[in-house]
Amino acid sequence: MTGVLTAEMNPETKKTCSVPSPEKKTEAEAHTDGSRERKPCPICPHHCNLSEGGIGLCHARGGVGGKDCLNYGDITSIALDPIDKKPLKRFHPGSTVLSVGSFGCNLRCPFCQNHEIATASRRGGQKASPKELADLAASMKARGNIGLAYTYNEPLVGHEFVRDCAAEIRMLGMKNVLVTNGSFCLEPLEGLIPLIDATNVDLKGFTQSYYDWVGGDLETVKRFIARLAGTCHVEVTTLVVPGKNDRAEEIDALAAWLSGLGDIPLHLSRCFPRHRFEGEPTPPDTLYKLADAARAHLKHVYLGNI
């Protein structure tokens, strides 16, 4: 996209969902056109400048042609998946769910398994309307499909499309499943949250230093999980990265916090080298040890990628 300015996150507002004043200049604007009127994006703590010509860190939101959501209806991946793959172990076990993804993500995990679409500005694919996807989901009921899952990239960077699809799915009496990193401010999502039946949230770690590594904010994710736990079925996944978030004390604290929100299943997954992460795979013994620590607080702890 020649001539399109890419915004960076606002370091001054990284740890809060309070939207900065449009008049306030940030370090990010030193790399763009400082004369542009600020239009802070409200959906995540990065608060990128989406004034005309700007594109957010997620690559899916920007001020281009008067549109904030740049990936509306863009489908890069679609498949009928087992519900276990989300992963959701205690929500309609044995069923399948039509799973769709677009492009864009507001984190920068070195180990991302879907980095081709998560970090893309635009990808070739197909266009689909919310009604078209809902009708496709309904046509697959005979194959065990319970609804639509929003996954693969980070779906909430295009929350308007997720909301519109979810409304169509709800009218058909089917289920909406959200797979997300949870690094989002709640107020812009209040119209969507009541439409979600189940979610798996990637709780990347349980220290802010870890979230600094992946480009996010721990407290924002904790608030997101707590809010969703009050309205729908919630499961949580933590990818265990050697030397980063594999201390028993950290997983113990994470599980203790989750237990205060209710009966939330926790998935501890093994990490393998991919994308920009060149470390060793997580030793299976580490996962077994961490699962024991988590089970001191939680009834349902599962291991993945073993």
Task: List each language-model region with its residue ranges.
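Short, conserved glycine- and acidic-residue-centered signature motifs
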Residues: 93, 126, 217, 283, ...
